[in-house]
Amino acid sequence: MIVGSEKFQYKWIENWVTIPDTPSGKQNGRTHGVVVTEENQIVIFNQANPAILTFDDDGKLINSWGERFAGAHGLTLVKTNGEEFLWLTDEFSGEVVKTDLDGKEVQKIHKPEISFYHTEKYSPTWVAEFEEGKRGNGDIWITDGYGSSLVHRYDKQGNYMLTLNGEEGAGKFNCPHSLFIDYRKNDP
């Protein structure tokens, strides 16, 4: 079966992937993130245990980890100094972490210490990194889509810089679910 249209057509391959033989693996939780690495490995971030599943392009499971991410949501693949990393958000625990492809944590971003969160919920949904290898400065942007409908900016070391609620533009945000940086033009 072919799905999609025009130049974005794909062949659907039934039972392409081998799911881990665990109760939650067979159930396969909600999947919010899928990325493809430079080596054509498919990384899936889902609300099951384990949360990260990595498959080769033949559908064989080659790695799994991330048992702590019950609220798996945002998955972003970035490249830093020639190495690929994953940004992960957990909507339940509020965790935002950067890991290598094997799950080793290399950076953690905490909820901003702003008065707004003394009474309001924080539930991050996505991360975008303004990658230095793509003419960026390394800044990290995080959406709080399922909490307070805010977007936070951090520098590359993880120091909080500012918060946007959308009123700076056309109107207040309503569940900013994800965000991406468009590198297709000279001025991203």
Protein language model regions, located:
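Structural signal for beta-propeller blades
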Residues: 50-53, 94-97, 106, 149-151
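Beta-rich, blade/repeat-based domains predominating
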Residues: 24-39, 68-84, 114-139, 169-188
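Beta-propeller domains
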Residues: 9, 32-33, 37-39, 43-67
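A detector of repeated loop/turn-to-beta-strand junctions in beta-rich toroidal repeat architectures
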Residues: 49, 93, 121, 147-148, ...
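Conserved beta-strand positions in repeat-built beta-propeller and related beta-rich domains
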Residues: 44-47, 86-92, 131, 142-145, ...
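A short beta-strand motif characteristic of beta-propeller blades
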Residues: 14-24, 60-66, 107-118, 160-170
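Blade/loop signatures of beta-propeller domains
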Residues: 1-15
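Short loop/turn segments that connect beta-strands within beta-propeller blades
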Residues: 56-60, 100-104, 155-159
